[in-house]
Amino acid sequence: MEQQKESLWVKRYHFETTDSTNEQAKRLAIEGASHGTFVTADAQTSGKGRRGRSWESQGQTGIYLSFILKPEILPQNASMLTLVAALSVSHAIKNVLGESYIPYIKWPNDIVINKKKICGILTEMELKQGKIAHIIVGIGINVNQENFPKEIETASSIFLETGNYLETEKLIEEVLNCFEKEYAIFLETQDLEGLKEDYESLLINKNKQVTVLEPKGSWNGTALGITNKGELIVDTNMGCQYVSSGEVSVRGVYGYV
């Protein structure tokens, strides 16, 4: 008889309000919390996004989730977990909503419905003597919000884009289930080889004109897909360029996507 695999998820910490679930998860990891520990909150006071941006956190209308991973992988492969998480969130939302709506991925890790951002993901890594001590994957999903400030006009919620109110607990459970499956596939090769085709099928930038914003300037090209390492392949007049997520921001030539 086949033995049932143990779940990745070992313990949950839930807070009504916290500064940020990523910060809580970091504190727990430093205190010795196990691989597979996860943190949820009803509201955040200091939510964080990629490249130091803040994340709008309204109480009990969104999902604020962070989990602790302690994988035996090379540090340079850790950033790919951001894309693994994006794929998992897209699958989870689709599983809960049904086939009517496709949550696309704007490279590397924003989830968009109707070209509006409804989810952001932030992965942070702590090294000890050159090896991974822990990785925190933070996921913020706008679920049932009914309005947003004008200054974040590219943001929206699942409710605003689909008219569906979702049970946040059900969606959290689905995100964790999907991530566990995608994470196992990632660990087989320690890259995105087994997930690349699936990711590219949801990549809203694929075959579209994009603007790559770098510290030294910007340039345009056509996004073709991703490499097994999660780099965005951009076709330009000078040939194909490979863009790493930590260095740049990518926009559609005529707007957010």
Q: Where on the chain are the PLM-derived regions?
A:
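Long, positively charged amphipathic alpha-helical accessory segments at protein N-termini or as interdomain linkers
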Residues: 75-102, 113-257
